[in-house]
C-alpha cells in the first residue's frame, strides 16, 4: 500500500483510506479497531465468501432483482477474488466483531470497487453486492463452504494418500513377526503388517467420519438474512443461491432445514472439528508408535529406522531425531486445542446469532490445512521409507517370555506363569525353559511356540487351564 490516502465516507462520517486500497470506509474502521493478532482470515475463507457473493449475484439476477449488467460485473469481480487475485486487500484481523460483519463488508467493498471498474458506473457494496444477504447468514455460509471445499479438495485426498502408503508398507513388511506390546510391556507376537493395518484402519475410519459430516456441512443458512426470518430476501433466494453455488463448486449445497438453527448455532462446525480431533488423535498414536519403534538406535527398541532427514542436535554429533513424527504430534496438539476453541465458540450462540464466527472459521480451516499437510509429510517422509531391523526384532522375540501364553490351553495358567518367571529371571528363551519344566516333546513345543503361527490367533493346543 502507498503512503497517500483518499477520503471515504460511511454512515459514521469520513476517514482516510490508503489510496490504492480496494476497500472502503467500513473495512478501514475495522483495520483501525482490531490491531490484535496481525492474522487475517485464511485464503480459503475469503475465497468461499467471494463465491457466496458470486452465487448471490447470479441468484438475484435470475429472480429479476438485480440489473444484469451490475450482476455480471459483480460476478467477474467476485470470481477474481475467489481465485486469490486480491488477497492483500483483505487485512482484517480474525479477532473482530463476532458476527464477522467487518469481513463481510470487506468483501462487499472490494468486490464493489472491482465491479465498478468493470462496469464503468457505481456498484454499491450494500445495495448490490450484499443484496438479499446479511453478515449473519453470509459468514456462517462461508464457514460451511470453505470447510466443505478444503475437506474435499485437500484433507480427504491427503488422508487417502496416507492410507495408500500405509497399505503398501503393510504389504512390504507383512511377514515380519515382532513382539507385541501392551502397557509398553512385552506381549504376544504380531506381524508388523498387522500393526500397520491398525494404523491404516484408523485413517480409513477418519475418512469415513469426514464423509459422514457432509450432509450437514452442505446445508446452508443463506437466505435467513438478519435473524433467520429471511427479511429483505426473496422467498426463493435461498434455494436459487444454493443451486448457483453448487454449479460454481461442484458440491451439492442446499438450503438448511432451519435458518434459525443455521444462524444461531455452529453445531456443524463443532461436529466437524470433533472429527478432525479424532484424526489428530489417530495421527498422534501412529506418530508415537513410530517414535518408540525407532528409539535407540542402541539403547531403545530399535525395531525400525526412520529416514534420516536432518542432523538432530547442535551439540551431539551424529544424532538423528524422528522429526516428522514429532511434527505430527505437535500438529495433533494444535488441532486438539483448536477443537477446544471451536467448542467454546459454538457455545456462544446468544439467541438468534453466534458471535464467535471468525475464530471458529480460522480454527476450523487451520486444523484442516495442518492435518492435510502433515498427513502427506508423515506418509512420504516417515512411513514410506522406514527400514526394518530384522535382527533386533528376532532377538527380542526369541527372548519374549510372554510366548508361554500359547501353552495355557495345554499346561494351564499357573504352570505357564512359573515358566515365564523363570525364563525372565534367567534370561533364557521360553522354549528352553518350557522343555525343562514340562513333559512336552521338543517338536510339540516348537509347534506351539512358533511366533509365525501365533500371529494367526486361535487355540494352539488343548488340555487343562486357559483364560
Kindly give the residue locations of the regions a language model identified.
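Conserved, well-structured ligand/cofactor-binding cores
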Residues: 1-467
Amino acid at each position: 500500500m502507498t503512503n497517500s490516502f483518499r477520503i471515504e465516507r460511511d454512515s459514521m462520517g469520513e476517514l482516510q483510506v490508503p489510496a490504492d486500497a480496494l476497500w472502503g470506509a467500513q473495512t478501514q474502521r475495522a483495520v483501525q479497531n482490531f490491531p490484535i493478532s496481525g492474522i487475517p482470515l485464511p485464503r480459503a475463507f475469503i475465497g468461499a465468501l467471494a463465491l457466496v457473493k458470486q452465487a448471490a449475484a447470479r441468484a438475484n439476477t435470475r429472480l429479476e432483482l438485480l440489473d444484469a449488467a451490475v450482476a455480471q460485473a459483480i460476478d467477474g469481480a467476485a470470481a477474481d477474488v475467489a481465485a486469490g487475485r486480491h488477497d492483500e486487500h483483505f487485512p482484517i484481523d480474525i479477532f473482530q466483531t463476532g458476527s464477522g460483519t467487518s469481513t463481510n463488508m470487506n468483501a462487499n467493498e472490494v468486490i464493489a470497487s472491482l465491479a465498478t471498474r468493470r462496469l464503468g458506473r457505481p456498484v454499491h457494496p450494500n445495495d448490490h453486492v450484499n443484496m438479499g444477504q446479511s453478515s449473519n447468514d453470509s459468514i456462517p455460509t462461508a464457514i460451511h463452504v470453505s470447510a466443505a471445499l478444503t475437506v474435499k479438495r485437500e484433507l480427504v485426498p491427503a488422508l487417502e494418500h496416507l492410507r495408500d502408503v500405509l497399505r503398501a508398507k503393510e504389504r512390504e513388511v507383512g511377514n515380519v513377526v515382532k513382539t507385541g506390546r501392551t502397557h509398553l510391556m512385552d506381549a504376544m507376537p504380531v506381524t508388523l503388517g498387522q500393526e500397520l493395518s491398525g494404523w491404516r484402519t484408523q485413517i480409513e475410519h477418519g475418512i469415513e467420519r469426514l464423509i459422514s459430516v457432509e450432509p450437514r456441512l452442505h446445508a446452508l443458512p443463506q437466505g435467513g438474512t438478519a435473524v433467520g426470518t429471511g427479511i429483505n430476501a426473496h422467498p426463493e433466494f435461498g434455494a436459487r443461491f444454493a443451486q448457483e453455488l453448487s454449479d460454481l463448486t461442484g458440491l451439492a449445497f442446499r438450503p438448511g432445514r432451519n435458518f434459525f438453527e443455521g444462524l444461531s448455532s455452529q453445531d456443524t462446525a463443532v461436529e466437524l472439528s470433533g472429527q478432525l480431533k479424532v484424526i489428530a488423535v489417530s495421527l498422534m498414536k501412529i506418530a508415537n508408535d513410530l517414535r518408540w519403534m525407532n528409539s535407540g538406535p542402541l539403547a531403545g527398541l530399535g525395531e525400525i529406522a526412520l529416514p534420516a532427514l536432518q542432523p538432530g542436535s547442535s551439540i551431539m554429533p551424529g544424532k538423528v531425531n524422528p522429526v516428522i513424527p514429532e511434527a505430527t504430534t505437535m500438529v495433533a496438539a494444535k488441532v486438539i486445542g483448536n477443537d477446544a476453541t471451536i467448542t467454546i465458540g459454538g457455545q456462544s450462540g446468544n439467541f438468534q446469532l453466534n458471535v464467535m464466527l471468525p475464530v471458529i472459521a480460522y480454527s476450523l480451516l487451520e486444523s484442516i490445512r495442518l492435518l492435510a499437510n502433515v498427513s502427506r509429510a508423515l506418509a512420504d517422509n516417515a512411513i514410506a521409507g522406514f527400514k526394518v531391523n530384522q535382527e533386533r526384532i528376532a532377538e527380542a522375540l526369541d527372548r519374549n517370555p510372554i510366548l508361554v501364553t500359547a501353552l495355557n490351553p495345554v499346561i494351564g495358567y499357573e504352570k505357564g506363569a512359573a515358566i515365564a518367571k523363570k525364563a525372565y529371571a534367567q534370561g533364557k528363551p521360553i522354549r528352553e525353559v518350557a522343555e525343562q519344566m514340562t513333559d512336552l516333546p521338543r517338536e510339540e513345543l516348537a509347534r506351539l511356540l512358533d511366533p509365525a503361527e501365533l500371529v494367526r490367533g486361535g487355540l494352539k493346543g488343548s488340555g487343562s487351564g486357559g483364560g
